[in-house]
Curated annotation (Swiss-Prot):
Belongs to the UDP-glycosyltransferase family. This is UDP-glycosyltransferase 78D3. Transmembrane segments: none annotated. Keywords: Glycosyltransferase, Transferase. It is an enzyme of class 2 (transferase). Disulfide bonds: none annotated.
Length: 459
């Protein structure tokens, strides 16, 4: 790591969290690592009570002060049930919410904030706070470089594709942007060039792409060698651009418990399976396919005879075919939670079946495991396209939805056929590059030192 200068005694960093989906956990991981490296700096971590309670444990560094903030939902207001409604209410209220809480935290700690570290989605709150406090703004983008490119060049994409003509051009590639030659229009996130471009969320992400070049630094959970074209471009677009991942590999041994939480015995089960034979299926709690597709997954697994571990919420298990669990008891296991990183890194793991969220993709890359992707929303489609067409380490499920036959064919292709073997080779090459990036003198290791300087010593 590039050795940072000695932190000043009055360093105080505000960490503003976007408390939805999987955004909060990586930013907490970065904050913990920064706090460990700079013990004299106070990090005030702002998120909603619900987000904080689901993430935080007693073993976070003592120089992290946790603050619960309002969720932006007016008192007595009844949400529609659409998750995006809660997101939009929070985004609209965020600047005032964080302004109020930041002032209170400064009084409590007795130190002025010198740096505002935020999720990039909170660009407006960040710029507002940074300007008022004359503090630096360091932004964390929670996706990959390809999806960030779509946001950074939204205006160029709209101009070249045409918002009104987009329906006829969905299959065309975005070759007019360097590095996007294999990305199709339909792979971009909703709100870039199709969908409701006037929604609060779409406007927020559009403006985020315009605001990020004004940040003191932008960092992502990735590594330079995965997307070298984008890395070079971002270095000219941003004041400072830092890849500091994969975060799962960057954790030091002292931060990682030797005791793995595995309440359902997944690791003992996988020990008995042959090399590269197991399918791991997991979609998390935010984006699970509909019941009819859960049935198709179950049918495909049972018919294929592929050994499997399926992490599925208990409430979703009621949708599985009658008798499925009994009939496949020797073939696999369905559990409400599984130690994902440890499973992916086991030599018996053959394929990761996921929605293609960035954290899942990077964990699969870090473990050298091919993927079967079923995009659901957000950046899933653009990540899945990168998996299939750019890095060639997996496939996207045919027709975009799970069917019994389609899933069985995908399993066979990845686990048995020759092109699946090539995917495995490509995935292992990326795993090696990821390991090199986080090693001493590796690009991500050095970049974390740069991030530490930006956050603690303000560049």
């Amino acid at each position: 790591m590039a050795k940072p200068s000695q932190p000043t005694r009055d360093s105080h960093v505000a960490v503003l969290v976007f408390p939805f989906g999987t955004h909060a956990a990586p930013l907490l991981a970065v904050t913990c690592r920064l706090a460990t490296a700079a013990p004299s700096t106070v990090f005030s971590f702002f998120s909603t009570a619900r987000s904080n309670s689901s993430l935080l444990s007693s073993d976070i560094p003592t120089n992290i002060r946790v603050h619960n903030v309002d969720d932006g939902v007016p008192e007595g207001f009844v949400l529609t049930g659409n998750p995006q409604h809660a997101v939009e209410l929070f985004l609209e209220a965020a600047p005032e919410i964080f302004r109020r809480e930041i002032k209170a935290a400064e009084t409590e700690v007795g130190r002025k904030f010198k740096c505002i570290l935020t999720d990039a989605f909170l660009w407006l709150a960040a710029e507002t706070a940074a300007a008022e406090m004359k503090a630096s703004w360091v932004a964390y983008y929670g996706g990959g470089a390809t999806s960030l490119t779509a946001h950074l060049y939204t205006d160029a994409i709209r101009e070249n594709v045409g918002v009104k003509e987009v329906g006829e051009r969905m299959e065309e590639t975005i070759g007019f942007i360097s590095g996007m030659e294999k990305i199709r229009v339909k792979d971009t996130q909703e709100g870039v060039v199709f969908g409701n471009l006037d929604s609060v969320f779409s406007k927020t992400l559009h403006q985020m792409g315009l605001a990020l070049p004004r940040a003191t630094a932008v960092f992502i959970n990735s590594f330079e060698e995965l997307d070298p074209t984008f890395t070079n471009d971002f270095r000219s677009e941003f004041k400072r651009y830092l890849n500091i991942g994969p975060l799962a590999l960057l954790s030091s041994p002292s931060q990682t418990s030797t005791l793995v939480h595995d309440p359902h015995g997944c690791l003992a089960w996988i020990e008995k399976r042959s090399t590269a034979s197991v399918a791991y299926i997991a979609f998390g709690r935010v984006a699970t396919p509909p019941p009819v597709e859960l049935v198709a997954i179950a049918q495909g697994l049972e018919s294929s005879k592929v050994p499997f571990v399926w992490s599925l919420q208990e409430m979703k298990m009621t949708h599985l075919p009658e008798g499925f669990l009994d009939r496949t008891r020797e073939q696999g296991m369905v559990v409400p939670w599984a130690p994902q990183v440890e499973l992916l890194n086991h030599e018996a793991m053959g394929v990761f079946v996921s929605h293609g969220g960035w954290n899942s993709v990077l964990e699969s890359v870090s473990a050298g495991v091919p993927m079967i992707c079923r995009p659901i929303f957000g950046d899933h489609a653009i990540n899945a396209r990168s998996v299939e067409a750019v890095w060639e380490i997996g496939v996207t499920i045919s027709s975009g939805v799970f069917t019994k036959d389609g899933f069985e064919e995908s399993l066979d292709r990845v686990l048995v056929q020759d092109d699946g073997k090539k995917m495995k080779v490509n995935a292992k090459k990326l795993e090696e590059l990821a390991q090199e990036a986080v090693s001493t003198k590796g690009s991500s290791f050095e970049n974390f030192g740069g991030l530490l300087d930006e956050v603690v010593n303000f560049g």
